[in-house]
C-alpha cells in the first residue's frame, strides 16, 4: 500500500502494529486471524477501545491490509475511529496496541477510554 492510498483510508494501521500482529500470527500458526479493533461503552471517559483476534470478517466490516495481515473494524466502531491510527508500543509501562484518535475530545490517563 502506498502512502497516498494510506492517506485516503478512514483508519490507519502502522508498520509497528502490523509487524506485531504478523509476529503473533506466526506464533499462533494461524494466518487466518485478523486484529479486530472495536469501541464499546465504558471506561472512565465514556467509550473504550478493545482489541481481539478474529478469523471472520463480517458483512459491513472495514478492513485494512498491511504487511500481509489485516485490521478489521465493524461499522459502528468505525464511526468513532475515522481518521485514527492503530499503533503498537512496547516500553517500561508494558506492551500494547493503542489508538491515536483525533475524534476523542478527552481521554483517560492510560489512553484506554475516551469521549467524543
Curated annotation (Swiss-Prot):
Q: Where do transmembrane segments lie in this chain?
A: none
Free-text comment on the cofactor: Binds 1 iron-sulfur cluster per subunit.
Q: Is Membrane given among the entry's keywords? A: no
Q: Name one Pfam family in it.
A: Fe-S_biosyn
Record's keyword terms, sorted: Iron, Iron-sulfur, Metal-binding
| Xref: InterPro entries | FeS_biogenesis, FeS_cluster_insertion, FeS_cluster_insertion_CS, FeS_cluster_insertion_RrpA, HesB-like_dom_sf
Molecular function terms, GO-annotated: 2 iron, 2 sulfur cluster binding; 4 iron, 4 sulfur cluster binding; iron ion binding
Give the GO terms filed under biological process for this record: iron-sulfur cluster assembly
| Recorded GO CC terms | cytosol
Q: Which cofactor does it need?
A: iron-sulfur cluster
**Which Gene3D superfamilies does the record cross-reference, listed alphabetically?**
HesB-like domain
Q: Which residues does the record give as iron-sulfur cluster binding sites?
A: 44, 108, 110
Quaternary state and interactors? Homodimer.
The protein's role, per its UniProt record = Required for insertion of 4Fe-4S clusters for at least IspG.
Q: Tell me its family.
A: Belongs to the HesB/IscA family.
PANTHER family for the chain: IRON-SULFUR CLUSTER ASSEMBLY 2 HOMOLOG, MITOCHONDRIAL (PTHR43011:SF1)
Please give the name of this protein: Iron-sulfur cluster insertion protein ErpA
Q: Which organism is it from?
A: Shewanella oneidensis (strain ATCC 700550 / JCM 31522 / CIP 106686 / LMG 19005 / NCIMB 14063 / MR-1)
Amino acid at each position: 500500500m502506498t502512502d497516498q492510498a494510506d492517506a485516503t483510508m478512514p483508519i490507519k494501521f502502522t508498520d509497528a502494529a502490523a509487524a506485531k500482529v504478523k509476529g503473533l500470527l506466526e506464533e499462533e500458526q494461524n494466518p487466518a486471524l485478523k486484529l479486530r479493533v472495536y469501541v464499546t461503552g465504558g471506561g472512565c471517559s465514556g467509550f473504550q477501545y478493545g482489541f481481539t483476534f478474529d478469523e471472520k470478517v463480517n458483512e459491513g466490516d472495514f478492513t485494512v491490509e498491511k504487511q500481509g495481515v489485516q485490521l478489521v473494524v465493524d461499522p459502528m466502531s468505525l464511526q468513532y475511529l475515522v481518521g485514527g491510527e492503530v499503533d503498537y508500543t512496547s516500553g517500561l509501562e508494558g506492551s500494547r496496541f493503542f489508538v491515536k484518535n483525533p475524534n476523542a475530545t478527552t481521554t483517560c490517563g492510560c489512553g484506554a477510554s475516551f469521549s467524543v
